Design a protein with these regions (language model features):
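Glycine-rich, proline-tolerant flexible connector loops at the mouths of alpha/beta enzymes
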Residues: 61-86
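Hydrophobic residues in well-ordered beta-strands that form the structural core
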Residues: 60-61, 100, 128-129, 152, ...
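Second-shell loop/turn segments in exported
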Residues: 74, 124, 257
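Active-site acidic/histidine proton-transfer and metal-coordination neighborhood
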Residues: 26, 84-85, 90-178, 187-190, ...
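Residues that cap or flank secondary-structure elements
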Residues: 39, 78-79, 107, 131, ...
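Histidine-acidic metal/acid-base catalytic patches
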Residues: 20-36, 40-58, 121, 165-168, ...
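Active-site-proximal loop/turn and secondary-structure-junction residues that shape catalytic pockets
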Residues: 38, 63-65, 104-107, 133-135, ...
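Bacterial Sec-dependent N-terminal signal peptides
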Residues: 1-24
């Protein structure tokens, strides 16, 4: 009888483990999800429904998005406890996990502490931000205190953190301070995304993942289905594997805003295929 119970327990555990790691990237500790900004024309409630329909289970929220779903207000680190609880239930009821918040900045140390308290309460592991350089000492101390990652995001130049060197110059010694690597913005800045990842090795805490191409009359880059642009998606995946990266990877698709879900779903499919083929 005892033997049967042990076998049954093992099978149940194996089934649960298999279910939890049903996508190929799960075993590497990659939390492939979406920035809700990809669905900025919709409420947060609608965004998480769309994220779920794309085959994703992780969410990065952005400040200022109307919550919806019968909940008043906007996504914000200053929202009250009742609103936070309602948002957590909204996400959990969809079977999703909130892993990151950003890109968000705070004006002073007191507000940064409030931002960390918000992240702690919401179960958020990564705060994606582009703070002033002079704020970094107290941000680093708070990151150590709360054990929550502060990931410096790179918008294209002339933003301060457009180049990996500017990130490395300010992160200090805290293991909780590093990079939110946006590979599309590196390409927009004329940088090679694989070279940038190599330069930041050991300091990459999360990703904004996209593929971009410059094929419109105005000569500006725009998002395309992954694997069809200039972001070297396959090589980026291989490099992240080589570095043994672990953390959130947020789809950020800033094109065809009204109906980009099918393109995101196709990109996710490509990503998982490329991951499986990569050594």
């Amino acid at each position: 009888m005892k033997h049967c119970l042990l076998v049954a327990g093992f099978l149940a555990f194996s089934t649960l483990t298999s279910f939890a790691q049903r996508n190929p990237e799960d075993k590497a500790g990659w939390k492939l999800g979406s920035q809700s900004y990809s669905f900025r024309l919709f409420t947060f409630a609608e965004a998480i429904r769309k994220i779920d329909s794309c085959g994703l289970k992780y969410v990065e929220a952005f400040p200022g998005q109307t919550i919806g779903g019968g909940i008043e207000g906007k996504m914000d680190y200053k929202m009250d406890a009742a609103t936070r609880q309602a948002v957590k239930k909204l996400v959990a009821d969809k079977g999703l996990t909130l892993v990151a918040f950003g890109v968000v900045n705070a004006p002073n140390e007191a507000d940064w502490k409030a931002l960390f308290e918000f992240a702690k309460d919401m179960g958020i592991k990564n705060i994606n931000t582009e703070p002033k350089v002079e704020q970094m000492p107290y941000i680093g101390r708070l990151a150590d205190e709360y054990k929550i990652n502060v990931a410096l995001h790179n918008h294209p130049k002339p933003s301060h953190y457009w180049h990996p060197d500017s990130v490395l110059a300010v992160i200090g010694t805290s293991k909780y301070v590093g990079s939110c690597a946006d590979i599309g913005h590196w390409v927009r800045s004329g940088l090679d995304p694989v070279d940038c990842l190599k330069k930041l090795q050991g300091h990459i805490l999360g990703m904004h993942f996209k593929d971009v191409k410059k094929d419109t009359p105005d000569g500006k880059y725009h998002d395309v289905i992954w694997g069809t642009g200039d972001c070297k998606v396959d090589a980026v995946i291989a490099e992240l594997k080589r570095q043994k990266f672990k953390g959130p990877i947020s789809v950020e698709y800033e094109y065809h805003w009204e109906n980009n879900g099918p393109e995101i779903a196709e990109s996710v499919k490509y990503f998982r295929s490329a991951y499986s083929k990569s050594k």
